[in-house]
């Protein structure tokens, strides 16, 4: 299979699977964090509290993506980090993280 010369190679990630540290800088609890706390819900009691530590290592991650020659990156935001109480009061530190 051949790709056109203008094909854009990229990568994508999910906030819960990569960021870790959900309560850092005032972040709230997501549905996944609550689910993972339920006994027996997840094998071995695993959770995303550290994940890939993208919260602290995002600059290194960006360098790695660039070194792979990727020209696009799609990431998701953690609404629990942006609106920790689910009441529309934005967490400025959460917004700054994604800016």
Residue ranges and their predicted role:
Residues 1-99:
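Non-catalytic accessory regions flanking glycosidase/transglycosidase catalytic cores in CAZymes
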